[in-house]
């Protein structure tokens, strides 16, 4: 059942996520050495182990192809794992108990030993693994490339496009008071579970490599956001109600007059109108469209909840996310943060229309940021 999208609590959630470390890769320090243990990744010798199409991506510092020893992820109990990302980056990770996902999938979360400000999220879907590794000074990504192989990449977030400024919504007319029987109303839920419908384009699925890889990316995006809430001791969680491919070709702009966001939100144009019926069928609070542009200008955009539109915001709880940025740049959680009323960091947005805690934050000295901040540390 669709709920009214909360504002203050979620603004706080997104704004105080201090444990998602997303520093520029240029500040990479020597990572802690792993103990002697079997690594998750099995190197693939050249030339099969080379992935020039991945290495050519602007935000990729380096990459290599590997096989994944999935036997190390059998079961769901907590464990220690060696992430041998590269020859010079081998990390001991303490994983908590895996969370079950649909279709027998699993989501693992953990931290690197000796790095308090680190985060590891791994999602398994059959023989596919998708993962993000954040630690002070570096971001790493693991994605399937098909044929039983996976690419391990080091990501330079500063080379990714910026997030677009959120789109304000029209102020609705004041509601007219109507007599009603309060006792007859169903009790409202506490708002701690945010139901999200994710739709994606054929271009996004093709860029991901397959439908299974696309679904793993979506699972990872949700898991990344939920781990950030957990790290901040916030009880709220995202719940993926459905992930569906839609027949839609990117308009050329994630937002404009109109753009992808406006086509997603609108119900009177000829585009994406089935999304509204899907939203109603699955009771989604918010809807995210994942797109892919060969040379994206922005990582994403969303409508922003404002204090004067809280009661009438449901028709605007929509966001558009570029696949390239969805997880490694935390854009999925970032754009949903705008739906929840959060702003960019104070250096980008000085608006006081929400709460003092509903802005992104970055630490210039230690070079880390929260998900609502720009990559300007």
Ranges and model annotations:
Residues 1-8:
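N-terminal secretory signal peptides that target proteins for export/translocation
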Residues 10-20, 26-146, 266-267:
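N-terminal prosegments of processed precursors
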Residues 36-47, 51, 151-308:
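Fold-level signature of zinc-dependent metallopeptidase catalytic domains
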Residues 79, 108, 129, 194, ...:
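Residue-level detector of short, conserved catalytic/binding motifs and their immediate flanks
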Residues 97-98, 121-127, 136-153, 209, ...:
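Surface-exposed flexible segments
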Residues 112, 134, 198-203, 241-244, ...:
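Active-site-proximal beta-strand/loop segments in catalytic clefts of secreted hydrolases
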Residues 126, 191, 283, 314, ...:
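Short, solvent-exposed loop/turn segments at the edges of secondary structure
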Residues 244-262, 312-377:
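The catalytic-center signature of Zn2+-dependent metalloproteases
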């Amino acid at each position: 059942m669709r709920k009214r999208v909360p504002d203050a609590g979620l603004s706080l959630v997104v704004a105080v996520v201090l444990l998602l470390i997303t520093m520029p890769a240029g500040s990479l320090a020597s990572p802690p050495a792993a103990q002697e243990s079997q690594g998750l990744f099995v190197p693939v010798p050249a030339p099969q182990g080379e992935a020039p199409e991945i290495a050519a991506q602007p935000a990729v510092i380096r990459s290599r192809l590997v096989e994944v020893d999935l036997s190390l992820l059998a079961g769901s109990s907590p464990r220690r794992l060696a992430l041998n990302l590269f020859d010079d980056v081998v990390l001991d990770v303490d994983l908590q108990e895996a969370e079950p996902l649909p279709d027998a999938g699993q989501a693992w979360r953990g931290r690197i030993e000796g790095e308090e400000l680190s985060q590891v999220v791994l999602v398994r879907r059959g023989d596919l693994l998708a993962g993000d590794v954040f630690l002070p000074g570096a971001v790493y990504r693991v994605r399937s490339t098909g044929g039983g192989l996976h690419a391990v990449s080091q990501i330079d977030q500063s080379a990714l496009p910026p997030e677009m400024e959120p789109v304000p919504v029209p102020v609705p007319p004041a509601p007219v008071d109507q007599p009603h029987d309060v006792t007859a109303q169903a009790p409202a839920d506490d708002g701690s579970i945010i139901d999200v419908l994710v739709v994606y384009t054929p271009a996004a699925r093709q860029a991901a490599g397959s439908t299974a890889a696309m679904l793993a990316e979506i699972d990872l995006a949700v898991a990344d956001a939920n781990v950030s809430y957990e790290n901040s001791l916030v009880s709220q969680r995202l719940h993926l109600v459905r992930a569906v491919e839609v027949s839609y070709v990117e308009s050329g702009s994630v937002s404009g007059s109109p753009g992808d966001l406006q086509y997603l939100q609108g119900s009177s144009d000829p585009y994406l109108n089935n999304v509204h019926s899907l939203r109603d069928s699955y009771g989604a609070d918010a809807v995210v469209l994942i797109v892919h542009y060969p040379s994206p200008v922005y990582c994403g955009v969303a409508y922003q909840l404002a204090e004067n539109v809280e009661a009438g915001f449901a028709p605007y709880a929509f966001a558009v996310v570029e696949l390239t940025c969805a997880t490694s740049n935390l854009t999925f959680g970032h754009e949903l943060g705008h739906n929840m009323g959060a702003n960019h960091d104070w250096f980008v947005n000085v608006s006081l229309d929400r709460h003092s805690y509903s802005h992104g934050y970055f630490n210039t000295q230690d070079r880390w940021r929260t998900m609502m901040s720009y990559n300007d540390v």
